[in-house]
């Protein structure tokens, strides 16, 4: 038995973390059961910092408990395992982690900015900084620690340092600024080195949100960098940002905005004729402890001429990313590129579906204006990212497909889930969901890569389990939780968007919306269930408790524009009839038309349901952590809200006798009804589906729940709904050429045509394909429940999930009256296999086949 897939805090060989007692993790590649492990950690010189010795246990993780670690410490580590025969396996390959800069005293650098006066109404060219670094001695190692309020790109002698795109990533820069650590040992040379940095507006000062509001976090972009060179004689040279750095803003990038694009004069060269100006920020940078945003897949276009006479490039896949191109040209020749997700009725590129137009601004522009230099021009976008499948190019230059690429840009999340079936449309839907996850994982989970690009908490919470089946989402999600809790108010309220920049007064009133702000409890809860990580509950418990208290305070209260519920006594005491809320959100237009005015008034049905459910989760968390008094309080309110919901369900305004599927799915999913109501709701849901032609009538919150609910009592109904190819329905999207998941069931026809074609939320159905259709569920540490449920017209389905405990696979194939099952359980885990009409069986690692 050998340890594989070594990770530190869910990261591969992280450089510059700020966790001084990190958890070291691994998987087992063979054998049945791990009975013991040994972890040895050593420093740069090979001195042992920690040796666990042979430690009994099957846990595939150990928390570092060796000599205290300090800033800049490098630790290499390896693992040896003992199997069920007590035989010792080979040592694993070595892994490593390095501590970053832990405190303010470690930072000798000063914040610098461009040397010009700022008018927040103006836009400015990209700042260019330069520092000459002389090296005379032999180096042992060198590290660059760098961050910005804005976006930076750093180069050494013209070569980009690292592969991070859009660094330093997105946070609420008023609360937390994350820095990166780069190993530049091999990039430096003896003699003269030129360190150059470009600094752009980014999220800090650039366009943010649907309306493209600027200066959300500040209006002065700034840079902080510290280069530490350790020589072989033990001495360290430190080069820091200060007012000796050269500066100018006369370089090639004349304008750069995340959403709107870049204006580039390729013939310009920065003069660095001025000096940087000192400034301050008042926050000690923090390590990101997250995977970087990097370039991934590349696509070359099919080039045609659009009806409007401009060149039209079809890259074949809707992505979040940017372009690279090269061609020969004369100085001053100009090309203009626009990017979008769709074509209009005439066959020209349109941005209608992604733009919000106000009197002040149209955004996003998703545009590049490029003026050529003489000779060979080589360009790649630096400080913008777009959502697009198509590009429209206005130019008289010849464009060659092989010299143009669309580059997908997203966080370096590793795909862990794969699915295939006998239905090609369903397989395409899963692929589209994978692409929407990629396109909306850019340091934070976003709603779309075009119009808003916000970290909407509702999207994140409903999609978390699907994302975690499809990708290693652990480090990414932990970083996002930091963003969520960075904004928490003193009363416990959590934001609807994280990081939150304070969009406007109206949007501010929506913070605390159930289904959205509940992310602060639901992601840690589900993280614990999927990753077996109780530490995340410990880390956030007090803050989760604070949000739970905020929910409790709303019980029994009436809010602005609240309607009378017609209930009294205990039910009235626990009903939630206060607080603004998005409600179900985005139900099909013919089921419940969207009306922005709905958000002004409370949604007592949705709010009471979610308060009961979330406080129930919180009670379970408190119990497992040993907070029994808290658990009793949370359970009391959860049960109180449940009974209030049952009372409300007897009233005309909230009756279960409805064709609104969400009103039936939600209480069934959250177990809110009494026995009589439950049986009625089950039958009424089937009737509602029949009345709607077996199409999806749910909205944002209930769509991920409906198949789970149906499969519990009518599997045929679940499959009938899944296989529906008409609108509204999941398969309608791939049937109509979607390569990513749409925001609205109606696609581009919804909400007056404003609807993103890359919104992952409706792809949350993929969770059910893994845990329902193929039956893969994590059930505690090192244990799975495998309970596949064949059905519908499917003859075959297979899912594999590379979980934190190892890769598990489940497939089934029907042939006449027989169904063949194949199930693979990873080393050092067990599983309970539950097959139709067959007694449950508990198994250890191995592959198991059945024919039933």
Where are these regions (language model features)?
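Extracellular/oxidizing-compartment recognition motifs
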Residues: 1-451, 459, 475-476, 495-508, ...
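Alpha-helical support elements that line or immediately flank enzyme active sites
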Residues: 142-146, 322-341, 391-394, 458-488, ...
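Non-catalytic C-terminal accessory modules of carbohydrate-active enzymes
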Residues: 219-226, 239-271, 277, 285-296, ...
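Acidic/polar loop patches that form or flank catalytic/metal-binding clefts of enzymes
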Residues: 90, 205-207, 236-240, 337, ...
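C-terminal capping/lid segments that line or modulate ligand- or cofactor-binding pockets
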Residues: 195, 452, 470, 520-521, ...
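Active-site acid/base region of carbohydrate-active enzymes
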Residues: 151, 242-244, 248, 398-432, ...
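Active/binding-pocket-proximal capping segment
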Residues: 152, 160-163, 167-168, 484, ...
């Amino acid at each position: 038995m050998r340890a594989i897939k070594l990770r530190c805090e869910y990261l591969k060989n992280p450089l510059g973390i700020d966790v001084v007692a990190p958890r070291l993790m691994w998987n087992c590649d063979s054998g049945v059961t791990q009975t013991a492990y040994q972890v040895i950690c050593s420093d740069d010189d090979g001195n042992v910092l920690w040796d666990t010795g042979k430690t009994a246990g099957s846990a595939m993780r150990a928390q570092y408990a060796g000599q205290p670690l300090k800033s800049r410490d490098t630790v290499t580590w390896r693992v040896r395992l003992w199997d069920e025969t007590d035989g010792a396996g080979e040592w694993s390959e070595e892994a490593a982690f390095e501590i970053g800069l832990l405190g303010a005293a470690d930072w000798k650098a000063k914040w610098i900015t461009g040397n010009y006066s700022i008018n927040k109404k103006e836009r400015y060219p990209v700042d260019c900084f330069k520092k000459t670094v002389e090296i005379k001695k032999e180096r042992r190692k060198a590290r660059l620690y760098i961050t910005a309020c804005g976006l930076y790109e750093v180069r050494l002698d013209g070569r980009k340092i690292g592969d991070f795109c859009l660094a330093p990533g997105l946070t609420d820069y008023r609360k937390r600024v994350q820095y990166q650590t780069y190993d530049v040992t091999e990039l430096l040379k003896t003699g003269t080195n030129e360190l150059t940095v470009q600094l752009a507006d980014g999220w800090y000062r650039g366009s943010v949100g649907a309306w493209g509001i600027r200066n959300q976090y500040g209006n002065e972009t700034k840079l902080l960098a510290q280069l530490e060179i350790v020589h072989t004689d033990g001495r360290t040279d430190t080069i820091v940002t200060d007012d000796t750095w050269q500066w100018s803003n006369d370089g090639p990038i004349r304008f750069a905005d995340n959403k709107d694009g870049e204006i580039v004069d390729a013939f310009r060269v920065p003069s660095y004729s001025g000096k940087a100006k000192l400034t301050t920020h008042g926050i000690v940078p923090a390590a990101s402890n997250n995977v970087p945003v990097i370039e991934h897949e590349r696509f070359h276009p099919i080039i045609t001429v659009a009806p409007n006479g401009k060149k039209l490039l079809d890259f074949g896949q809707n992505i979040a990313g940017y372009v690279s191109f090269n061609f020969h040209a004369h100085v001053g020749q100009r090309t203009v590129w626009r990017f979008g997700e769709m074509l209009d009725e005439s066959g020209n590129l349109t941005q209608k579906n992604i733009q919000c137009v106000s009197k002040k601004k149209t955004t996003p522009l998703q545009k590049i204006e490029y003026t050529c230099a003489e000779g060979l021009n080589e360009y790649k976008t630096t400080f913008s990212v777009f959502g697009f499948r198509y590009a429209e190019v206005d130019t008289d230059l010849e464009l060659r497909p092989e010299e143009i690429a669309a580059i997908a840009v997203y966080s370096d999340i590793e795909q862990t889930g794969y699915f295939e079936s006998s239905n090609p449309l369903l397989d395409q839907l899963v692929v589209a969901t994978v692409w929407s996850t990629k396109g909306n994982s850019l340091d934070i989970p976003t709603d779309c890569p075009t119009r808003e690009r916000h970290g909407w908490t509702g999207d994140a919470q409903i999609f978390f389990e699907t994302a975690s089946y499809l990708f290693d989402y652990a480090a990414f999600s932990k970083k996002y939780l930091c963003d969520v809790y960075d904004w928490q108010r003193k009363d416990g309220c959590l934001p609807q968007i994280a990081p939150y920049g304070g969009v406007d007064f109206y949007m501010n009133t929506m913070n605390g919306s159930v289904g959205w702000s509940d992310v602060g409890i639901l992601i840690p809860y589900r993280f614990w269930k999927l990753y077996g990580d109780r530490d995340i509950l410990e880390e956030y418990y007090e803050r989760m408790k604070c949000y739970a208290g905020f929910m409790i305070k709303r019980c029994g209260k009436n809010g602005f524009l609240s309607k009378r519920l017609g209930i009294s006594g205990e039910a009235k005491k626990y009903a939630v009839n206060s607080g603004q809320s998005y409600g179900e959100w985005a139900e099909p237009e013919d089921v419940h038309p969207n009306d922005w005015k709905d958000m002004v008034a409370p949604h007592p049905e949705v709010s009471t349901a979610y308060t009961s459910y979330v406080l129930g989760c919180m009670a379970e968390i408190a119990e497992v952590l040993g907070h029994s008094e808290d658990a009793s309080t949370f359970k009391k309110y959860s049960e109180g809200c449940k009974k209030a919901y049952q009372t409300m369900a007897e009233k005309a305004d909230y009756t279960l006798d409805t064709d609104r599927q969400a009103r039936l799915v939600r209480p069934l999913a959250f177990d809110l009804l009494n026995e009589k109501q439950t049986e009625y709701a089950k039958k009424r849901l089937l009737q509602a589906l029949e009345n709607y032609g077996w199409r999806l009538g749910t909205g944002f919150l209930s769509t991920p729940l409906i198949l789970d609910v149906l499969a519990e009592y009518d599997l045929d109904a679940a499959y009938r709904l899944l296989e529906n190819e008409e609108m509204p329905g999941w398969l309608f999207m791939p049937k109509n050429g979607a390569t990513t998941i749409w925001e609205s069931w109606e696609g581009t026809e919804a909400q007056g045509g404003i609807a993103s074609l890359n919104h992952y939320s409706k792809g949350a159905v993929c969770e059910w394909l893994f845990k329902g259709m193929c039956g893969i569920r994590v059930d505690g540490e090192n244990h799975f429940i495998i309970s596949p449920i064949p059905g519908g017209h499917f003859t075959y389905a297979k899912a594999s999930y590379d979980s934190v405990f190892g890769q598990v696979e489940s497939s089934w194939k029907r042939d006449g009256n027989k169904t063949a099952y194949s199930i693979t359980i990873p080393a050092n885990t067990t599983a309970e296999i539950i097959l139709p009409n067959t007694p449950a069986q508990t198994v250890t690692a191995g592959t198991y086949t059945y024919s039933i």
